[in-house]
C-alpha cells in the first residue's frame, strides 16, 4: 500500500484509524519510517560504566550490541555475524574485549571490526577483506544526561533537538537532580498488543486512572486513592499536558501526586525530594524545581516511557502488529540512600513489572484495543482523542511546547499521533520536516475545520 497520501490520523491528531493497532502491512511500513528513522532508547551509562561493558538492546525488531569503548565512548552494532547471519551475542549483558560467533568462530572486536577468522590464510588466502566485514554500526549514538539513544538515520536531528520542548520538563529530573541511575536487568514480558497502545497510554493519559486502576488505588494510601472509580476529578490546577514537534510529550501531575505508584514509600520519597527541592528552588527556579518533585508520565517518541518519581522506565519493543515485548527498569537518583533505591526498584517491579498489579490493569485494555484493530468491521472506525481540544496553547510564557493546562486531557495524544502521521506519510526526514512546518498551528486550532 502507498501510505504517502493515506490518512491514518486526522489533522490536529483528533482521530486515528483503528487499524493502526492491528494492520501487519502497516507495521512493516512502520519499521521503515518509525524504527529506522527515529531515536530509540538503548541503555544508560550506569549499566555499562567500564570499557568492555556491553548490553544487548532492541531497535525496532532488530537486536543490537551496545558497548563501552576503551576511550569511554559508546558504540552500537547489529547483533548479527557478518558471515552467515547468526546472532552473535546471546547474553543480555557482560564485559568482553570482543565477540566470537559460535557458528564458524569469526571474532569481532568491541569496536565492531572483524579481527579473526579460523584458518583464514589456509581457506581464504588473500581474498578476505576483513576491513569491509565489520559489524553493521548504528549510525548515531547520543546521550541525554546518561540515557543513551541510537538512530540508524544520519539525517535525523540531534537527540537534544529531537526531544525538543519535552527536554525542558525532563531536565530538572534527569540533570539537575544530580543524576539518575537505571536499575537492571529489565523485567520482560510479552503482551498481545500493538506497541503504540502502551506508548500512548504513558504519553499522558490520566483520564483512565480512576476506572482502570480503581482496585489498585484502593489497596494503598496516597493522594490519588480518592480517584478510585472516578469518584472525584483532580482539582483545577493539579497538572498540565504538553507535546512537541517530534511527538514526545507528557502529563505533569504537580507536587503530592508524585508517589502514587509506590504508596508505601511516599513518606520517604516526599522527605528526600522535599529537601532537594528547596535547594533546586535557588539553583534553577521555582517552576523547574516544582517539576523535579512532580509526577511526569512521559513518552519519548516512539516507544520509550517514564513515570518519574514512581521510578518506572519502560521500553515498548515491537514484535509484530499485535505483539510487544515490554522491558521495565527502575530509575533512581544517584544520591538516594541505598536502601531507598532498593525499595523503590522493588516497588517498580511490584506495580509495573511483568506481574505488577498496575501493569495487569493496563494490559487488558491495551490487548483488546489492539486486537480489535485487525477485525473487519472495527478496523476502519475512528478512535477519538479530542479531550481538551481547542484549549491548547503554544508560546506560553512559562511552559514550552503545545500545552493544555489540565491534568486530564489528550493534548499529548494528539501530538504523538500528528508526528506518527507525518512519519508514515514521509519517505525521509526532509519530507517529515515539510509536513511538520505548521505543527503547533495544527495542534492549537480551536475548531476541527
UniProtKB/Swiss-Prot annotation:
GO molecular function, one term: 2 iron, 2 sulfur cluster binding
GO BP annotations listed: catabolic process
Cofactor remark from the record: Binds 1 [2Fe-2S] cluster per subunit. Binds 1 Fe(2+) ion per subunit.
CDD domains: RHO_alpha_C_NDO-like (cd08881), Rieske_RO_Alpha_N (cd03469)
Superkingdom of origin organism: Bacteria
Positions with a binding annotation for [2Fe-2S] cluster: 81, 83, 101, 104
UniProt domain Rieske: residue ranges: 39-137
Description of how the protein assembles with itself and partners: The naphthalene dioxygenase (NDO) multicomponent enzyme system is composed of an electron transfer component and a dioxygenase component (iron sulfur protein (ISP)). The electron transfer component is composed of a ferredoxin reductase (NdoR) and a ferredoxin (NdoA), and the dioxygenase component is formed of a heterohexamer (trimer of heterodimers) of three large alpha subunits (NdoB) and three small beta subunits (NdoC).
Annotated protein name in UniProt: Naphthalene 1,2-dioxygenase system, large oxygenase component
Organism name: Pseudomonas fluorescens
Gene: ndoB
Amino acid at each position: 500500500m502507498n501510505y504517502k497520501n493515506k490518512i491514518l490520523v486526522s489533522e490536529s491528531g483528533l482521530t486515528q484509524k483503528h487499524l493502526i493497532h492491528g494492520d501487519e502491512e502497516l507495521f512493516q511500513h512502520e519499521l521503515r519510517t518509525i524504527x529506522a528513522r527515529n531515536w530509540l532508547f538503548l541503555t544508560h551509562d550506569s549499566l555499562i560504566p567500564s570499557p568492555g561493558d556491553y548490553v544487548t538492546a532492541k531497535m525496532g525488531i532488530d537486536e543490537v550490541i551496545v558497548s563501552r569503548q576503551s576511550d569511554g565512548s559508546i558504540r552500537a552494532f547489529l547483533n548479527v555475524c557478518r558471515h552467515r547471519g547468526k546472532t552473535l551475542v546471546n547474553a543480555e549483558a557482560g564485559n568482553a574485549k570482543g565477540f566470537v560467533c559460535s557458528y564458524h568462530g569469526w571474532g569481532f572486536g568491541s569496536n565492531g571490526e572483524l579481527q579473526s577468522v579460523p584458518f583464514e590464510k589456509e581457506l581464504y588466502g588473500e581474498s578476505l577483506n576483513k576491513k569491509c566485514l565489520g559489524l553493521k554500526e548504528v549510525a548515531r549514538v547520543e546521550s541525554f544526561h546518561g540515557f543513551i539513544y541510537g538512530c540508524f538515520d544520519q539525517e535525523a536531528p540531534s537527540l537534544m533537538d529531537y526531544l525538543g520542548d519535552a527536554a525542558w520538563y525532563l531536565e530538572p529530573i534527569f540533570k539537575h537532580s544530580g543524576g539518575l541511575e537505571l536499575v537492571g536487568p529489565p523485567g520482560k514480558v510479552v503482551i498481545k498488543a500493538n506497541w503504540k497502545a502502551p506508548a500512548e497510554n504513558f504519553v499522558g493519559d490520566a483520564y483512565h486512572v480512576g476506572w482502570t486502576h480503581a482496585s489498585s488505588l484502593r489497596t494503598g494510601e496516597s493522594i490519588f486513592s480518592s480517584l478510585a472509580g472516578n469518584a472525584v476529578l483532580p482539582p483545577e490546577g493539579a497538572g498540565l499536558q504538553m507535546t512537541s514537534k517530534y511527538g514526545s510529550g507528557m502529563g505533569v501531575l504537580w507536587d503530592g501526586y508524585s508517589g502514587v505508584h509506590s504508596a508505601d514509600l511516599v513518606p520517604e520519597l516526599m522527605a528526600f525530594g522535599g529537601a532537594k527541592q528547596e535547594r533546586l528552588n535557588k539553583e534553577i527556579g521555582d517552576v523547574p524545581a516544582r517539576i523535579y518533585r512532580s509526577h511526569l508520565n512521559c513518552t519519548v517518541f516512539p516507544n520509550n516511557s517514564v513515570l518519574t518519581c514512581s521510578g518506572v522506565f519502560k521500553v515498548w519493543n515491537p514484535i509484530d502488529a499485535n505483539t510487544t515485548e515490554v522491558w521495565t527498569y527502575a530509575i533512581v537518583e544517584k544520591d538516594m540512600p541505598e536502601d531507598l533505591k532498593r525499595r523503590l526498584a522493588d516497588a517498580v517491579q511490584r506495580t509495573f513489572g511483568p506481574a505488577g498489579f498496575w501493569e495487569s490493569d493496563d494490559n487488558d485494555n491495551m490487548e483488546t484495543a489492539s486486537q480489535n484493530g485487525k477485525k473487519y468491521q472495527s478496523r476502519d472506525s475512528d478512535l477519538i482523542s479530542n479531550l481538551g481540544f481547542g484549549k491548547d496553547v503554544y508560546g506560553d510564557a512559562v511552559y514550552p511546547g503545545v500545552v493544555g493546562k489540565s491534568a486530564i486531557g489528550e493534548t499529548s495524544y494528539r501530538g504523538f499521533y500528528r508526528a506518527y502521521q507525518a512519519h508514515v506519510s514521509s519517505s525521509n526526514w526532509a519530507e517529515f520536516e515539510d509536513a511538520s512546518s505548521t505543527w503547533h498551528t495544527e495542534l492549537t486550532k480551536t475548531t476541527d475545520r
